[in-house]
Regions:
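Catalytic-site microenvironment of enzymes
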Residues: 1-167
């Protein structure tokens, strides 16, 4: 059984004893846990991760996957790579809106819908910046939620699809 989440007033921080936590390089931020007040709570916690939104994340390198395995798909970081930006800046829409702003908007809407449906929600990011790299986000989600939804848009026309990874 993994160590319990570090919970303080609804905030969950990276516990350094969790598996793979030692590979995180940006981890001074915290996720926020919301408990559903719906009439029929599900007893399930969904982690909602608004992709991107870590100032300085693009200049720090971490492993592509917390367990050190290489990427199997291409994209911004090519297939076979074992390191990448801790949190990339994401793409920019034609109107100049950054991906991080759109994913944050989507995450807030999804949070409200999940809470109303009886799910507890762990929000990785609720503002323009959270100091949690992709490894910290994944490790927190794996230890403090039942499932992890990472919201992203892609800026290329290849390598599209839904990808699932469990560590």
């Amino acid at each position: 059984m993994p160590p319990q989440a570090c919970v303080d007033s609804g905030e969950i921080t990276l516990n350094p004893s969790w598996k793979y936590a030692e590979f995180s390089k940006i981890n001074s931020g915290a996720a926020v846990l919301y408990r559903s007040e719906a009439a029929s709570p599900k007893g399930i916690t969904v982690c909602v991760n608004a992709g991107h939104g870590t100032k300085g994340g693009a200049s720090v390198k971490t492993q592509c996957h917390p367990d050190g395995t290489p990427k199997v798909t291409g994209g911004t970081t090519g297939a076979g790579a074992t390191s990448a930006a801790a949190v990339s800046g994401g793409m920019t829409f034609a109107d100049g809106t950054p991906e991080s702003k759109v994913t944050l908007s989507m995450a807030k809407i999804l949070k409200d819908k999940l809470l109303a449906a009886g799910y507890d929600v762990l929000m990785i990011r609720e503002s323009d910046d959270v100091q949690l790299d992709n490894i910290a986000r994944t490790v927190i989600a794996n230890n403090a939620s039942d499932c992890h939804i990472a919201l992203h848009w892609d800026s290329t026309t290849n390598n599209k699809g839904a990808f699932y990874m469990s560590v």
